[in-house]
């Protein structure tokens, strides 16, 4: 009973409720002191109207049931949402009770993990069974975790005298992954390291070894020496030998998350998207790829080649933020024991080549192969070229991009 009264008082404006009760009391006094058929008829009409107005406050929007569905990547055969995509939200509501409801205003609030929010408001006209449907589309969303707060429902009676409010909570949250771009090839100069023992290679794709790894379907153009005759005889269709590929040294992607290094949030989003795209490239090439995010609380993922670990890295990039106040070299010193020797150390950072050269020297002393990807603003082209040439003069593979579309060409062109 206490809960019902609380819902009733929360969903109805006190001023309008007081006005309705005042009119009913005046009619009651009119019947008591005046009497007669006219006063009795007026009191009966006002009483029925009061019962309807107050009764609507105990039901209707205070007992609305809803179900929400988020439609985005699932429409294209997957469940993953990427930054820049719009999300289609479908909200189905059911209003219990027999009292008619002319319309209902629904207010939705979508909140991002960093505090940003978007508000959506529209009207729903319930049918005779009290069911209604609201469909709306969000603007293009950036990476992050999103959740809907409590839904607010507002309705009025058929006379427009009383306004009723109610709140319902439907737990709905989803994650938006960083933007990625397809990288067809990555030319990298892996120099011979005395500590790491790797060899000099500049390759856009891994060469095949003589070790047979399995059997695959015949592809037009395969040499006769590649045909697997035993498998062809057993299956009745042409089969070819599948050879193992040369393995690239493990790659460690280091994302610089300095709070002072990035001019604005979009520049950091570009760095995150570049890291995610390179992780996807490593999965495509079956190369062991790891991730180190130099945030306020640095986190490291060891190089791995299976899909589960790759998805963990991508999911981690959803929540990462540029909040580190200390120098990058200090963050690396705390975790350098976990960096594999001989690995390719790719630094993604907005720092200039002069500042990055100190990091590159540190990488070389730890027996790793340095590589630098500079994230710049589009209006800093001249500064970017001077910065990159400084590292290129030392034989370090260096790239510079100011937008995600430039990444495939920059990596494919080499240093």
Please name every model-derived segment.
Residues 1-67, 79:
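Extracellular/lumenal glycan-associated context and N-glycosylation machinery
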């Amino acid at each position: 009973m206490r809960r019902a009264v609380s819902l009733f008082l929360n969903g109805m404006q006190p001023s309008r409720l007081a006005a309705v009760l005042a009119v009913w009391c005046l009619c009651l006094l009119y019947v008591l002191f005046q009497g007669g058929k006219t006063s009795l008829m007026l009191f009966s009409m006002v009483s029925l109207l009061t019962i309807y107005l107050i009764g609507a406050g105990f039901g209707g929007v205070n007992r609305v049931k809803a179900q929400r569905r988020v439609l985005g990547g699932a429409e294209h055969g997957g469940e993953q949402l990427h930054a820049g995509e719009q999300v289609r939200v479908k909200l189905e509501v059911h209003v219990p009770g027999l009292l008619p409801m002319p319309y209902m205003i629904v207010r939705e609030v979508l909140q991002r993990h960093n505090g940003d929010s978007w508000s959506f408001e529209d009207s729903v006209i319930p049918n005779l069974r009290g069911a209604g449907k609201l469909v709306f589309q969000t603007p293009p969303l950036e990476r992050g975790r999103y959740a809907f707060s409590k839904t607010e429902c507002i309705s009025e009676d058929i006379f427009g005298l009383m306004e009723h409010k109610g709140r319902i909570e439907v737990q709905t949250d989803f994650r938006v992954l960083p933007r990625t771009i397809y990288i067809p090839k990555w030319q990298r100069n892996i120099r011979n390291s005395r500590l790491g023992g790797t060899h000099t290679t500049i390759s856009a794709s891994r060469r095949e070894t003589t070790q047979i790894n399995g059997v695959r379907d015949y592809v037009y153009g395969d040499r006769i020496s590649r045909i697997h005759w035993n498998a062809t005889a057993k299956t009745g269709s042409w089969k070819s030998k599948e050879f193992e590929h040369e393995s690239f040294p493990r790659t460690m992607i280091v994302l610089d998350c300095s709070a002072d290094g990035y001019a604005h949030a979009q520049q950091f989003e570009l760095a995150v998207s570049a890291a995610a795209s390179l992780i996807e490239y490593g999965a495509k090439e079956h190369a062991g790829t790891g991730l180190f995010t130099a945030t306020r609380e640095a986190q490291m993922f060891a190089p791995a080649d299976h899909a589960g670990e790759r998805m963990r890295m991508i999911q981690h990039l959803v929540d990462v933020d540029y909040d580190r106040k200390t120098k990058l070299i200090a963050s690396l010193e705390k975790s350098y024991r976990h960096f594999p020797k001989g690995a390719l150390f790719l630094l993604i950072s907005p720092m200039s080549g002069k500042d990055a050269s100190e990091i590159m020297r540190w990488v070389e002393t730890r027996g790793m192969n340095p590589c630098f990807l500079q994230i710049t603003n589009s209006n800093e082209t001249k500064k970017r070229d001077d910065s990159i040439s400084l590292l290129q003069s030392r034989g370090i593979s260096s790239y510079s991009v100011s937008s995600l579309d430039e990444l495939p060409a920059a990596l494919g062109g080499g240093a």
